[in-house]
Amino acid sequence: MQYLCQRCHSLINFKDVYDDDLLKLKNLPKSRFVQASSLTEMNESGESDDQMNSSSEDYPAQRLQLYKKTISEGDYNFDNVPPPELRTPTLDSFVVLPAAKDGYEEEKNSPEEVNDLFSWKIEIYNRIFDLLSSKTKVDHPLCVECAELLTEEMSKTLRALKEEKKMYFNYDNFLSSQTVHEENTAALDSEIDELMKQINEKEEKIEEISDETDKLQKLLRELDEEKEKVYAEEQEFYNNLNQFQIKKLSLERQYDCANLEFEHNSRKLEKLQKMNVFSDIFYISHYSEPNGEGSIATINGLRLGRLPSQKVNWAEINAAWGMTVLLLDVLTEKLDFHSSSYQLKPFGSQSFIIRFDRDPNGNQVKPTKLDLFSSGELKIFMNRRFDQGMVAFLDYLHQFGDFCAAKTPSAVLPYAIENDRIGGKCIRLAFNQDENWTRALKFVLTDIKFLEAYVSSQDKQSNF
């Protein structure tokens, strides 16, 4: 028969007892149960102890007294003892049937007795282990090593309890040996009264402190509420500040963009202000002959005039006259100049000028159309109209120059104009050399270029 130790879970081997002896012991509890029940009945019937002693001659008197005391104080009931069986099997335990020993005579006991014997052994062990487990804080069964360790621990506990008992006993003796005198009692009473007075004062002070604590707690709650309110206001302030910062950054970006755009436009405006629109549209220059025999004035690349060494066709000359008329008309319109004697009509290569004549009475007669172009034919009438047109154009230019000089005295034409001459050169084509006529036309374009610069400067000043 083997069990497991409830502490280390190792196997526990029990020494087998001879079955004959167990059979003898098996009958012993039954006789004791009978005697116990008989003792109980005798107590209930009022029999004396002597009678009980006489009926229990098998037991010593001292053991019988202990047994009776145990029965009377305990809650044991032996009337309904069940037959031996495994009622409370031990956990983690098992039974191993031992092999037959040498020399054991199986024929002495019947199989029923052998089975009953093993059941009874299991029941006895289980009862013992249950009893030990209920009386101690340790589950049973235990192996030898665990039992020794438990014994040592319980011995240490016992020694500690004995020491504690001894200490209490000595202290009790010390208190018992102290004698209290009446003076000491009076002094102690006075001291007790003083202590009670101090206790009362402390209690009053505690109440005052408690009241002050309540006030402080109330003030603390108010401060907490104020803190929450301030925190909420702070959060709102920072939210507004963040929104303001975002808006500020957006406005700063817009401001930077506007500044960049303004700087760009300012540079562009400055560039445009420095730019002479008239000179860009009507570019006036001159064309020099390779052999150095003279130069011809040009407007937008069109030659205005001709030289003996280079015969310029009249289509180019007429186109150059058309550009010249258009430029002078734009300049006069820009300064709001109006002549009472002439009116320019720019029509490209067929441009002309209208002259308004008056009779001796000052009345205006029919306007005269004067051409500023020529076909190149040697017809006196055609050249006469062309010459009159160029003289009228020169007079119109002279009037416009005087108009500009009246506004700005320093604005004097580079080449003076007098009747049909400019810079001392006649502008008529008839009875004139090509070199002189071409030079007169060059002086005309030079004066117009001067007026062009003047009008451009006046335009810039008006813009500012």
UniProtKB/Swiss-Prot annotation:
Signal sequence, start to end: none
Gene Ontology cellular-component annotations: cytoplasm; endosome; endosome membrane; phagophore assembly site; phagophore assembly site membrane; phosphatidylinositol 3-kinase complex, class III, type I; phosphatidylinositol 3-kinase complex, class III, type II; vacuolar membrane
Species: Schizosaccharomyces pombe (strain 972 / ATCC 24843)
InterPro entries reported for this sequence: Atg6/Beclin, Atg6/Beclin_C_sf, Atg6/beclin_CC, Atg6_BARA
Location of region: Disordered: 38-57
Superkingdom field: Eukaryota
Subcellular location: Endosome membrane; Vacuole membrane; Preautophagosomal structure membrane; Cytoplasm
Name of the protein in question: Vacuolar protein sorting-associated protein atg6
Membership in a protein family: Belongs to the beclin family.
A molecular function (GO) term: protein-macromolecule adaptor activity
GO BP: autophagosome assembly; cellular response to nitrogen starvation; late endosome to vacuole transport; macroautophagy; mitophagy; phosphatidylinositol biosynthetic process; protein transport
Keywords from the UniProt entry: Autophagy, Coiled coil, Cytoplasm, Endosome, Membrane, Phosphoprotein, Protein transport, Transport, Vacuole
